[in-house]
């Protein structure tokens, strides 16, 4: 699907998002204070989140699984780069074969080795000597790192390939968002369709949690968008972010949304302040657009990797 939506957020929009995350956390906290532990919705969801259908461990040793997963992530990173570049340029993902974007010469196999080829070629094309975009090794390294961390976190379970696929979708969406402030509908609309059966059958989540997460995630961001537009007369964020939160809500459930939103808001605000200090602009800083998709993706990955531990710590903190 080629149709796209803007994915930008302003400083005022970031503040609104952080306030919304704080309110969501307050609501969860109040629920714990009013209910016995055995009746808490978080306590019930905690058990469901850990129900994974595992592959027999004898088939794959952990000490081999993590390096293999990291290598797989590096290889997938090359494909993610193709998706990002060709989406932005409007080319087909399948044809033509991999080539230099400057001289259009087809790349040989030794020029396609993740990260290593970039280092051996010293960051430039072997024929025309034009620079290779730094995005290529960074995306490959990021993909390898996230794949290795997922393998370490989940091991050889059904959760690993599920989260690997969706992490790859988030990497591609973030790369596109950083380049042109757009989140593709193929990911933001196709993702929820895939996330529903994945969450229910592979991750052991109740279908009510998956649907409720999507409704709360997308609905909350849509409400912020509409209220901000009504009060300020401008868009505080792009509609692509609303659709991305729909996907993340389905995949992570309603209890993952406060952490995702908080991490995204705080990290985006920190990036905004850093950019404001390093790159002075003539336009008002509060109107400076920031691609929000990468920060939502970061929040989702933090939840996937350590959300249960953070949730357990938060429960102990608020219940004494």
List each model region and its residues.
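Extreme N-terminal basic, low-complexity initiation segments
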Residues: 1-19
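Short terminal hydrophobic/aromatic SLiMs and anchors at protein ends
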Residues: 6-10, 22-28, 36-41, 47
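Short, strongly hydrophobic alpha-helical membrane anchors
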Residues: 48-62, 316-320
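Alpha-helical membrane-inserting segments
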Residues: 80, 84, 146, 150, ...
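Membrane-proximal soluble regions of multi-pass membrane proteins
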Residues: 83-135
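Interfacial loop-to-transmembrane junctions
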Residues: 239-240, 280-299
């Amino acid at each position: 699907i080629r149709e796209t939506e803007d994915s930008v957020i302003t400083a005022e929009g970031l503040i609104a998002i952080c306030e919304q995350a704080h309110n969501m956390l307050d609501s969860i906290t109040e629920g714990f204070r009013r209910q016995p532990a055995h009746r808490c919705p978080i306590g019930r969801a905690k058990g469901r989140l850990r129900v994974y259908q595992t592959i027999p461990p004898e088939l794959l040793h952990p000490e081999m699984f993590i390096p293999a997963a990291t290598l797989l992530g590096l290889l997938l990173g090359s494909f993610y780069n193709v998706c990002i570049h060709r989406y932005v340029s409007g080319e087909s993902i399948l044809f033509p074969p991999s080539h230099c974007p400057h001289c259009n010469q087809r790349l040989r196999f030794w020029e396609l080795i993740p990260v290593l080829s970039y280092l051996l070629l010293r960051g430039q094309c072997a024929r025309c000597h034009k620079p290779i975009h730094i995005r290529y090794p960074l995306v490959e390294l990021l993909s390898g790192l996230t794949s290795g961390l997922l393998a370490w976190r989940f091991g050889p379970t059904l959760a690993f390939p599920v989260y690997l696929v969706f992490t790859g979708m988030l990497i591609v969406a973030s790369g596109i968002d950083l380049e042109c402030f757009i989140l593709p509908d193929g990911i933001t609309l196709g993702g929820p369709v895939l996330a529903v059966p994945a969450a229910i059958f592979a991750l052991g989540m109740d279908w009510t949690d998956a649907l409720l997460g999507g409704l709360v995630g997308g609905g909350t961001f849509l409400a912020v968008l509409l209220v901000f537009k009504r009060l300020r007369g401008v868009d505080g964020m792009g509609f692509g972010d609303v659709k991305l939160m729909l996907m993340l809500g389905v995949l992570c459930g309603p209890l993952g949304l406060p952490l995702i939103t908080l991490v995204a808001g705080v990290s985006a605000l920190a990036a905004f302040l850093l950019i404001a200090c390093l790159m002075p602009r003539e336009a008002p800083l509060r109107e400076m657009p920031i691609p929000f998709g990468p920060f939502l993706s970061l929040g989702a990955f933090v939840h996937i990797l350590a959300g249960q531990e953070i949730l357990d710590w938060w429960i102990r903190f608020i219940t004494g």
